[in-house]
């Protein structure tokens, strides 16, 4: 059950990432420095809750995907 919930969350995040890639607005998109809750995508430094995708440094609760360093705070 926990795996199913995590998988569902991952699918939702992928859908959001796809929507952002297609040019629809989303919170905290772009490379460089992003801070705050919501959705973050791009290289550089990310801090805050929500979903983080990309290389660099990630900090905050939620889901982290990408190279380098990531942990849940």
From Swiss-Prot:
Superkingdom: Eukaryota
Signal peptide: 1-19
Residues with Arginine amide modification: 72
Keywords: Amidation, Antibiotic, Antimicrobial, Repeat, Signal
GO annotation, biological process: defense response to Gram-positive bacterium
Placement of Sequence repeats on the sequence: 32-37, 38-43, 44-49, 50-55, 56-61, 62-67
Expression sites (tissue/organ): Expressed in hemocytes and at very low levels in ovary. Not expressed in adipose tissue, brain, caecum, gut, heart and nervous chain.
Coiled coil segments of this chain: none
Function: Has antibacterial activity against the Gram-positive bacterium B.megaterium LM101.
Protein name, entry field: Armadillidin
């Amino acid at each position: 059950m926990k795996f199913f919930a995590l998988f569902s969350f991952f699918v939702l995040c992928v859908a959001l990432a796809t929507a952002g890639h297609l040019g629809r607005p989303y919170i905290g998109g772009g490379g460089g420095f992003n801070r705050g809750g919501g959705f973050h995508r791009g290289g550089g430094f990310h801090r805050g809750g929500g979903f983080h995708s990309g290389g660099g440094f990630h900090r905050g609760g939620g889901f982290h995907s990408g190279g380098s360093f990531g942990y849940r705070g």
